[in-house]
């Protein structure tokens, strides 16, 4: 089930300061709030590693990276020390790579699950190839509701996806055919259309900004097929996700 969280000083844009996948979770090292880290820890401890980090000294790590169970791509602003910290902290099977892309806010420009990535139409060709190789995904250049920042206006798991609330039916059908999961047009944080800023999700759990309403939370739980997390369920889903990649 989805859990409400907030960053420092009642900031509900939790996705800007964290990144959640089926193999790991990254949390901003600059947060002064212990509750932000422990919120993730309460659902993920003992299941996947939770790593605190910054990228180029910035706490807005969710905006500056993109990843899935196969890999993690980081903005060119990341320092050598930060890069080595992540390589040392994440599972050996996760490929961690810095990418020399002019659009440094990778999390805003790319939305992905473990199989497909939707990307900003103006990404460099080399970047597209690196995304495909490192994340192990099919890559599609797209817009969502006429917005090029597809990573901001879409969140995906292997079970479903949520997109900008102004996405029309024809576009929803096209996007669903590309990503091969059910989609819903929705909001988080009491009407925010910047989906990924207020939502982090993987195949068995999700975290939403603290302003997310009960109705919005219900939509998240339904589209991403989240159930009441129990140890056996979480463990089996995590193992299945990792085995798919590493065997």
Swiss-Prot record:
Q: How does it assemble?
A: Monomer. Associates with the 60S ribosomal subunit.
| Disulphide bridges | none
Quote the function comment for this protein.
Binds to the 60S ribosomal subunit and prevents its association with the 40S ribosomal subunit to form the 80S initiation complex in the cytoplasm. May also be involved in ribosome biogenesis.
Among InterPro entries, the record links this protein to: eIF6
| Single GO term (MF) | ribosomal large subunit binding
Keyword Nucleus set for record = yes
Q: Which HAMAP family match?
A: eIF_6
Q: What happens when the gene is disrupted?
A: Causes embryonic lethality.
Q: Where in the cell is it found?
A: Cytoplasm; Nucleus, Nucleolus
Q: GO CC terms for this protein? A: cytosol; nucleolus; nucleus
A single GO BP: ribosomal large subunit biogenesis
Database matches in CDD domains: IF6
Major location category of this protein: cytoplasm
Protein keywords: Cytoplasm, Initiation factor, Nucleus, Protein biosynthesis, Ribosome biogenesis
The protein depicted here goes by the name: Eukaryotic translation initiation factor 6-1
Name the domain of life: Eukaryota
The UniProt similarity line reads:
Belongs to the eIF-6 family.
């Amino acid at each position: 089930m989805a859990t409400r969280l907030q960053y420092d000083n009642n900031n509900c844009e939790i996705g800007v300061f964290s990144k959640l996948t089926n193999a790991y979770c990254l949390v901003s090292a600059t947060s002064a709030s212990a509750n932000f880290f422990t919120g993730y820890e309460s659902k993920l401890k003992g299941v996947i590693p939770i790593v605190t980090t910054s990228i180029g000294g910035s706490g807005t790590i969710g905006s500056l990276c993109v990843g899935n169970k196969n890999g993690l791509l980081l903005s060119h602003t990341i320092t050598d020390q930060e890069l080595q910290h992540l390589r040392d902290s994440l599972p050996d099977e996760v490929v961690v790579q810095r990418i020399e892309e002019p659009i440094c806010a990778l999390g805003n420009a790319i939305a992905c699950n473990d199989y497909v990535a939707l990307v900003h139409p103006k990404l460099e060709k080399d970047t597209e190839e690196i995304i495909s190789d490192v994340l192990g995904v099919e890559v599609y250049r797209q817009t969502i509701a006429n917005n090029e920042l597809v990573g901001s206006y879409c969140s995906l798991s292997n079970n479903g996806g949520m997109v900008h609330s102004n996405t029309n039916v024809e576009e929803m059908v096209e996007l669903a055919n590309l990503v091969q999961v059910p989609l819903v047009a929705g909001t988080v944080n009491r009407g925010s259309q910047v989906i990924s800023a207020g939502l982090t999700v993987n195949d068995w759990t999700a975290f939403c900004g603290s302003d997310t309403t009960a109705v919005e939370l219900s939509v998240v739980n339904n589209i991403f097929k989240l159930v009441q997390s129990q140890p056996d369920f979480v463990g089996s889903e995590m193992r299945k996700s990792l085995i798919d990649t590493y065997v």
